[in-house]
Amino acid sequence: MAVSSSSFLSTASLTNSKSNISFASSVSPSLRSVVFRSTTPATSHRRSMTVRSKIREIFMPALSSTMTEGKIVSWIKTEGEKLAKGESVVVVESDKADMDVETFYDGYLAAIVVGEGETAPVGAAIGLLAETEAEIEEAKSKAASKSSSSVAEAVVPSPPPVTSSPAPAIAQPAPVTAVSDGPRKTVATPYAKKLAKQHKVDIESVAGTGPFGRITASDVETAAGIAPSKSSIAPPPPPPPPVTAKATTTNLPPLLPDSSIVPFTAMQSAVSKNMIESLSVPTFRVGYPVNTDALDALYEKVKPKGVTMTALLAKAAGMALAQHPVVNASCKDGKSFSYNSSINIAVAVAINGGLITPVLQDADKLDLYLLSQKWKELVGKARSKQLQPHEYNSGTFTLSNLGMFGVDRFDAILPPGQGAIMAVGASKPTVVADKDGFFSVKNTMLVNVTADHRIVYGADLAAFLQTFAKIIENPDSLTL
């Protein structure tokens, strides 16, 4: 897949004839010399433009809706090499795929601004394209100035800390002398008054130690020279627990000796971001055992014709979703949800360096043979990093199958923006009792579904799984 450029544009566009993706470039503002001439002053307002020097910037294109930066995998052309319109110039790695970037212009690759293995944000200049050989040196100077300015920005020293002059000493206020406000009212507890009367103690002469000078029973007993009772002595309040500052960072264990740190690839960064985002969605999980004897028999019949087990499972899931559309719904803003008009089954595929989910669009409507053919094409594109954006970001329901690795059960993490994801385990011989109490051995696989509890409830998911199990256990409808 290739990407090419068009003057004075900044957004990506598709070129259907070559199945390429185009990105924009513009004439460098600092090198423009524009003269507008009116062609027909009386009747027309059209203007023509002449440009003295055309040095165009090659921008980092947005290859997907979630892409914020791209990585230069390799430059196909070298500096100074002549380019023809439509030729691929550079390979860019997005968060999902590798794509060729091509140009709409004849000229020369004057300068490479972003080297191989480096990343750049979407819209940033990654190279310069000159119209003639005479402009190559000028473009290289421009590229050098760009590089030096970016380095200068990176090493700008932080301003020295501002030292404040010592604050002037604040005069301490003079001690305040207590002023008598005349005879005060004696405040004592009822029991203290009773004790004072019993022991003939002048209550007015007792100094209170209670709240706000209140005279307590122990104060009276002290004044009377009597040992206070144990019950009258209030135990000292326990010391408050020490206030500790809340940790703002997680204390990670130190790196083991001889360990190495490997930075995320663009794809791994995208997966990490999606997994963290999924933590904000309230989910629940439901498991369901499914008898696969009939499905296994059907698979043996259609396998020689190119039908895959993935296609069988995707077809069964699509047919079940058609009967339970709420499981195929999406909640993206936390305030509403939408019933998707298509059933697009995304299937997880492990590829070198990450994970991607090619999408089988309209899985409920395609027949098994076309679905299998489409799936093989998608897997080939995924492993060569040639998937187009709509082939991996349009899923409404996800299927993850680890049964091929012998895994009998597992839970899958719900992708953001989808209502549910199905985790399919391996089919294994299991002893099962029928309704009459007779035991037999049947092949059974465990299916676990993780769903968004904001839109899908337990009864919805249970009904969906029952329908899915009936289709698998009676798979004749899959071949229709």
UniProtKB/Swiss-Prot annotation:
UniProt region (Disordered), positions on chain: 140-168, 224-245
Effect of a null allele: Embryonic lethality when homozygous.
MF annotations from Gene Ontology: dihydrolipoyllysine-residue acetyltransferase activity
Keyword tRNA processing belongs to the record: no
Alphabetized UniProt keyword annotations: Acyltransferase, Chloroplast, Glycolysis, Lipoyl, Plastid, Transferase, Transit peptide
Ranges where the Peripheral subunit-binding (PSBD) domain occurs: 187-224
Annotated InterPro entries: 2-oxoA_DH_lipoyl-BS, 2-oxoacid_DH_actylTfrase, Biotin_lipoyl, CAT-like_dom_sf, E2/Pdx1, E3-bd_dom_sf, PSBD, Single_hybrid_motif
Position of the signal peptide: none
Cofactor note: Binds 1 lipoyl cofactor covalently.
Pro residues bias: start-end ranges: 234-243
Domain Lipoyl-binding: 55-133
Assigned EC number: 2.3.1.12
Localisation: Plastid, Chloroplast stroma
Keyword ATP-binding: no
Swiss-Prot/TrEMBL cofactor(s): (R)-lipoate
Pfam families the UniProt entry points to: 2-oxoacid_dh, Biotin_lipoyl, E3_binding
Compositionally biased tracts (Low complexity): 142-156
PANTHER family: DIHYDROLIPOAMIDE ACETYL/SUCCINYL-TRANSFERASE-RELATED (PTHR23151), DIHYDROLIPOYLLYSINE-RESIDUE ACETYLTRANSFERASE COMPONENT 4 OF PYRUVATE DEHYDROGENASE COMPLEX, CHLOROPLASTIC (PTHR23151:SF83)
Family as reported in the entry's similarity comment: Belongs to the 2-oxoacid dehydrogenase family.
Descriptive protein name: Dihydrolipoyllysine-residue acetyltransferase component 4 of pyruvate dehydrogenase complex, chloroplastic
The organism of origin for this protein: Arabidopsis thaliana (Mouse-ear cress)
Lineage: Eukaryota, Viridiplantae, Streptophyta, Embryophyta, Tracheophyta
